[in-house]
Amino acid sequence: MAVPLARVRPVVVRSPEPAPKGITVLRRLRRSELPVGAVALARYLIGKTLVRELPKGRIMGRIVETEAYLPNDAACHAFNGMTPRNRSLFLERGRVYVYFIYGNYFMLNVSAEKEGVGAAVLFRALEPLEGIKMMKRGRRHVAEKDLARGPGRLAAALRVTRRFDGLDFCAPGPLWLGSAVRPAGRIGRSVR
């Protein structure tokens, strides 16, 4: 049954609690662990760790807010079909999708469906865990608590650009998803 467009809104998922101290990434997530579907994946990623490998160290943050974009949502870049710009949205789940908005910000997403179906989860906020000095580099005016709050700041903190588009979060590389302690509290869900 088709959902009327007027009722479709991106789903925002947030973690209500801070990460336990001393958390470490145990291992890279495997594609088989990622649920199929944007809403399920958005919820699953809360509490996981986003890792950016750099020549001089590692930046790491606990995912605390995500936003699901469904194929039938007019706000989803896949809504009007595949183009060269949004091709990564249509790859198997777990692929990086990066786009540039307002002439100023990169947005970091992960593809969320089976190959050929365009859907994504936008990373909206991270709790910095490691590499805070590297996150601040060139952004000294940003308070530590705000370094990765908001999707534009998150991408800037991780130094993500369009060149990451299409990479695999589940394969060895400069950007990957790791396992972490799941939040003990309730995970909130709302429409935007």
Identify the function of each model-found stretch.
Residues A2-R192:
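Conserved, well-structured core segments that form or line functional sites
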